[in-house]
Amino acid sequence: MNFQEEEFVLLRNTIDGQKRLIDYVDTPKTTEYRNNLIKINSEYALHWFDLRIKNVEVSKLAARLERDETTLPIDLSKRFLYRIFTQGSFKKGGRFYRGWWQNVPKEYRPYITIDEGFTSEYDYSQLNPHMLYYSMNKEMGEEDAYSRVLDGEHRDIVKQAFNAMIQADTQLRACPENIDIDKIDISWIDLRERILTAHKPIASLFFQGTGNAMQFEDSQIVENILLQTTDSKTPALPIHDSFIMRQQYASDLEEMMRRAFHSRFGEDIPVSSEIIIEPPRLFEDDGTPRTDEMAVEDREHSQWFDR
């Protein structure tokens, strides 16, 4: 790929009810975004990102993704990032997309490797709620932003509803199609009101189309982190509010994330981490080589080794 000729900064708008890419006139800021992406992607080109799963799992995963209309197949050649801005504005959206790892289901992400090395994933805890509260100069408190709504139950559904209410520019009288309200024993209207009650300090931000502006804020944080990891030649792979990085550099990533958020909001945010999987043991506790076991391991992952 010729990075100088590829357009990495894209602008979308809704036209006749359809999201479409639109042309735009360059500004110093769009040129900066593009140059930063060229820098990030040029570093990515020096590394190899892969998925270390057993051969028998490869076809299973491919079939699963094919059945899911919301996901794309995993194509390891899709190694570079693009920024997509929304609503015809370079102050809306701006998240980083099109890296193949963003299509990997959560339970498979532990097996993402960078330069054949095992990885860890770090993520911001409740990024959207924290940004919203800080934007209003309010403290969110220690209690989980989603669990507080239904006394700890149905957290995933509450999170979906919370984000839908922040994204919407209407009052959302009807439940969004992607939320399975039948899983809980209250109506959509009741859930909506409970979220508003639980988050009175930021109630004015719901139903105002705030979500795309918040996406721009988190995309600026992501850019900050990606530029730092590019400078240190230790690439990190973004998945919205989380990052995947080789395990030996993970502690550096955590500090980068804290600094990047603080530089944007002047406040701190919890960062959670997970050492995802441990490399296979080459030796027994007594020092005996695990030759037979490693031979089996190699055969089971031969497609990964062959790449």
Segments and roles (model prediction):
Residues 94-208, 215:
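Helical catalytic core of nucleic-acid polymerases
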Residues 143-152, 267-278:
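A generic structural motif
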Residues 214-220:
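Surface segments flanking catalytic/ligand-binding clefts of nucleic-acid enzymes
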Residues 220-239:
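Active-site palm subdomain of RNA-directed nucleic acid polymerases
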